[in-house]
């Protein structure tokens, strides 16, 4: 696997540029934007990523994933997604030992390989589904090793990946379903639902123009 091991030193990020990106990507959400700017200021102070990630909690359709993409854009990092609702076996994350015929690396190691570098944003969708393991252990326990910044070991590759350059951004609908150890790894941002009028504005001024741009109709 071709992975470039990068320094976890972060150059200063212009808060005004960060705000411009947030305004371009998100409608309203003033408290959310301010919380993200505070995180950027902290990064500028230490030149490292915070020891905690962001947990975005709110109903479906409130732009949680879009917030995560905007943060990755501000940090100028590649991003990858983990959909916890589709993961029911820890080996899907950690990989399986080479002693087995169908052994292969786990999703996390594959994400590092696809990004080509060790510094990236992990967008963990539906974190509140992470405890739904079936028989072979709890996927949430694997996430804890990824979030601890002590390095992540894949069972297939049998090597440790530095994780100090990983910034996790998780989404959830119901934070009461998330274990206390996992919750302790995140700063929680509650995302309020949009009104019907706000949804119309978002569709006409944000969603539709982006779709038309992708289709080259603008």
Where are these regions (language model features)?
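Pre-Walker A (pre-P-loop) alpha-helix and adjacent loop at the N terminus of AAA/AAA+ ATPase modules
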Residues: 2-57, 108, 208-209
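Conserved nucleotide-binding/hydrolysis micro-motifs of P-loop NTPases
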Residues: 62, 85-88, 99, 127-130, ...
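Conserved alpha-helical scaffold flanking the Walker A/P-loop in AAA+ ATPase domains
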Residues: 99-124, 155-160
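Conserved catalytic/switch belt of AAA+ P-loop NTPases
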Residues: 123-162
């Amino acid at each position: 696997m071709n992975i470039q091991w990068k320094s976890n030193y972060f150059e200063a990020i212009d808060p005004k540029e960060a705000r411009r990106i947030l305004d371009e990507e998100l409608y309203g959400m003033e408290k959310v934007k301010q919380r993200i700017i505070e995180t950027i200021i902290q990064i500028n102070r230490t030149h490292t990523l915070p020891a905690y990630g962001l947990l975005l909690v709110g109903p479906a359709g409130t732009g949680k994933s879009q917030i995560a993409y905007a943060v990755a854009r501000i940090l100028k990092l590649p991003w990858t997604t983990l959909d916890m609702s589709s993961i029911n076996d820890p080996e899907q994350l950690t990989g399986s030992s080479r002693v087995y015929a169908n052994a292969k690396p786990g999703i996390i190691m594959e994400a590092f390989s696809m990004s080509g570098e060790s510094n990236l944003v992990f967008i963990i969708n539906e974190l509140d589904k992470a405890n739904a393991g079936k028989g072979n252990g709890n996927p949430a326990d694997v996430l804890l090793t990824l979030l601890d910044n002590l390095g992540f070991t894949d069972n297939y590759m049998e090597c440790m990946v530095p994780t100090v350059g990983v910034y996790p951004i998780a989404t959830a609908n119901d934070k009461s379903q998330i274990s206390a150890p996992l919750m302790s790894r995140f700063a929680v941002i509650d995302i309020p639902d949009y009104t019907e009028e706000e949804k119309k504005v978002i569709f006409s001024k944000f969603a539709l123009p982006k779709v038309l741009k992708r289709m080259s109709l603008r």
